[in-house]
Amino acid sequence: MAIKSDQISSLIKQQLEKYDSTLKIDEVGTVTYVGDGVARASGLANVMSGELVEFENGVYGMAQNLEESEVGIIVLGDFDGISQGDTVKRTGKVMEVPVGDEMIGRVVNALGQPIDGNGAIKTKHTRPVEFKAPGVMQRKSVFEPLQTGIKVIDALVPIGRGQRELIIGDRKTGKTSLAIDTILNQKDQDMIVVYVAIGQKDSTVRTQVETLREMGALDYTIVVSAAPSEPAPMLYLAPYVGAALGEYFMYNGKHVLIVYDDLSKQATAYRELSLILRRPPGREAYPGDVFYLHSRLLERAAKLSDELGGGSMTALPIIETQAGDVSAYIPTNVISITDGQIFLDADQFYSGNRPAIDAGTSVSRVGGDAQIKAMKKVSGTLRLDLASYHELEAFAQFGSDLDAPTQAKLARGRRTVEVLNQPLHQPMPVEHQVIVLYALTHGYLDDIDVSDIQRFQKELIDFVSGDKSYKKIFAAIKKTGNLPDEKDINSAIDDFKKHFSKSVEPTDYVAPSTKQEANK
């Protein structure tokens, strides 16, 4: 079969008409140095700060230092496959991570990739890792309580949804345990939790994940982990990745709790990166913008206005101190950024008070507006009572000849400290806390020995919960947030005390008549 030349030319013309010529220009540079999670490259004259660049082996990096002839790049992954002389090209994009409901219940690394062995995560959305915090007019005042389930916090240092509350203390004083207990208490609270482990040992993170799984808390929690064995860029980025994961839910009208455990290690990783990038060191060898490192992260936690959906993101950053020194550089920076701090005292921890919260130095600047009325009523004098107890306790060591009112204050103080002690991983609903603190502040525990206090409060809660005529007290507090008729509460506690069996009679009990006579 013969093919005519005009047919061939016609086919060629048709193909040429379909051909679309597009010119693609890539700006390519050359790697001049690589090591310790950092690379330097020349030839990327137009690269932007924070822009993603791609190395020859497919690993990505983020442009950080924009210098006259070179660009300092932090490598997002394994830098062993990158060599001097390799090509590196611009992408024109910023770093983004996958976000969405599919991330809940998973453990991911600082790039949002799963590391829990449960397969790939397929999400429909991504968010930039760096994102501008909401402005003044995009926010709303904090007014909704975030119940931690920890009596001493909910009573003395209340936290509201959208607040930034710092947890600060020496190593091994219970900072992480406090955060984990708060996460456990968010069950049935319509809350999504992001737990960011920065520089925590893999074995420690595994233990925390198993605790969350056993308690049913992993069903509403995302865990972001950057292990100490990973390069410094991973530890630096992990908190921002966690914030991006939380922001997705916040901007969709949901409530989020995010825990950064801990930001001291992020600051150390950032110092390491900055020194390798040859940025001028400042105080304690940190770079000049270390304050901005944390401020731009923590400002992303907010209570959004109704126009933006009314969602919130509450941040609990953790900072580790050395020998209780809160005046060091990083602690003072973060204290000035946050809306209050919970200070954990090593002396209290080793004396057996758990959680070891120092009520005198711990403060919540905005949480009081979010505290429920019932808790305000029963905890109003608690801080002063504790302060006067600690003062009297120090004074009482010098002599035993004390008058009756002083003895009564010391006895009440011992019971207050014992009531505020709480076992690990046993958060208490706020309505139960209110009844226990009511019994304490109204003198119902004065004739109960300190050794019986924990059993007394547990049995009191069981009694009120199980009694048909009294369980409405808990329901009323939960529904209205206010104290019901005090006659009902007094009646319930009086009835319970008739059935409560003391294991021992208190030796420090001061009868009311003795107190009154001494006052005369």
Swiss-Prot record:
It catalyses: ATP + H2O + 4 H(+)(in) = ADP + phosphate + 5 H(+)(out). It is found in: Cell membrane. Its EC number is 7.1.2.2. Its main location: membrane. The keyword Repeat does not apply. The record marks 362 as: Required for activity. It comes from the Bacteria. InterPro entries: ATP_synth_asu-like_sf (IPR023366), ATP_synth_asu_C (IPR000793), ATP_synth_asu_C_sf (IPR038376), ATP_synth_F1_a_nt-bd_dom (IPR033732), ATP_synth_F1_asu (IPR005294), ATPase_a/bsu_AS (IPR020003), ATPase_F1/V1/A1_a/bsu_N (IPR004100), ATPase_F1/V1/A1_a/bsu_N_sf (IPR036121). It is a peripheral membrane protein. One of its GO terms (cellular component) is plasma membrane. CDD domains: ATP-synt_F1_alpha_C (cd18113), ATP-synt_F1_alpha_N (cd18116), F1-ATPase_alpha_CD (cd01132). Gene3D superfamilies: 2.40.30.20, ATP synthase alpha/beta chain, C-terminal domain, P-loop containing nucleotide triphosphate hydrolases. PANTHER family: ATP SYNTHASE SUBUNIT ALPHA, MITOCHONDRIAL. Produces ATP from ADP in the presence of a proton gradient across the membrane. The alpha chain is a regulatory subunit. This is ATP synthase subunit alpha. The gene is atpA.
